[in-house]
A protein has these predicted regions:
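Conserved Lys-Pro-Asp/Glu-containing loop-to-beta segment of HAD-superfamily phosphomonoesterases
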Residues: 4, 142-171
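A short, structured active-site edge motif that brings together acidic residues
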Residues: 42, 124-140
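Glycine-rich phosphate-binding loop signature in dinucleotide/nucleotide-binding domains
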Residues: 100-102, 153-159, 214-215
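Acidic, Mg2+-coordinating phosphoryl-transfer loop and its flanking beta/alpha structural elements
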Residues: 161-200
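Conserved phosphate-coupling serine/threonine residues in phosphotransfer and NTP-handling enzymes
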Residues: 12, 108-110
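Short, acidic loop-to-helix structural element flanking the phosphoryl-transfer center
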Residues: 78-106, 116, 143
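Conserved H-loop
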Residues: 34, 124-129, 156, 201
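N-terminal helical cap/lid subdomain that shapes the substrate entry/recognition surface
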Residues: 2-88, 92
Length: 216
């Protein structure tokens, strides 16, 4: 019986995948590297660890550090974030699941301060029991952050499902012992996600059917 829902943020509840694609191309063009011609190609390519994805795109990190590249991404992301919205149904679904008695937290690779600021900006304050971001914006340590929280709070992995949009979310779920559901409208394509062998949804509203009416 599922009682706990761990949400990924970027690409799952927040519809920011297209600006990630745009930022990737801005940064590639600045460096004279080949840009990604199609949005769907980006969704086939994107992966974790993010530093490896940068290397796949052609970054060498000989004249700049990963930290410098990550800082530039965060700056561009902050400028473009006002053009983003929540995923269709995000507020409706999280409100309904909260009212049904599900315990909900967010586990994100985003820095803690950035995550908290984004939650406020999009009117999601108070929706979740805990916001678990990272110490910085380098996109490391998501699984360990989740594992520590679950141990501290006595959250039973067998009663927990992680909802995310990447194969990395699946890997995190495996490492913390939780179930996993993936949404195919985020940073990775359905083709990539199908390799994980877990349920895949297209709309967040499908979760209202998947999860029971009330937590028992």
């Amino acid at each position: 019986m599922v009682k706990n829902i761990i949400w990924d943020w970027n690409g799952t509840l927040l519809d920011d995948t297209r600006i990630n694609y745009e930022i990737a191309n801005i940064m590639l063009e600045e460096r004279g590297l080949k840009t990604i011609p199609e949005y769907e190609q980006y969704r086939e390519m994107f992966g974790f660890p993010v530093i490896d994805w940068y290397i796949t795109m052609g970054y060498s990190f000989e004249t700049e550090t990963y930290e410098q590249v990550a800082d530039e991404y965060v700056t561009l992301y902050g400028r473009m974030l006002p053009g983003c919205n929540l995923k269709d149904g995000a507020k409706e679904v999280t409100c309904e699941l909260r009212d049904r008695g599900y315990r909900q937290i967010i586990l994100s690779a985003t820095g803690q301060d950035t995550l908290e600021e984004n939650i406020r900006k999009f009117g999601m304050t108070g929706m979740f029991e805990e916001l678990l971001g990272q110490e910085n914006d380098l996109a490391f340590g998501k699984s360990e952050r989740g594992r520590q929280y679950m141990q501290r709070c006595g959250m039973n992995p067998a009663e927990t499902v992680l909802v995310g949009d990447t194969d990395h979310d699946y890997e995190v779920a495996q490492l913390i012992g939780a179930g996993c559901i993936l949404i195919d409208s985020g940073n990775q394509s359905r083709t990539v996600l199908e390799k994980c062998g877990v349920p895949i949804i297209h709309s967040l509203r499908e979760l209202l059917v998947i999860f029971g009416e009330h937590v028992k």
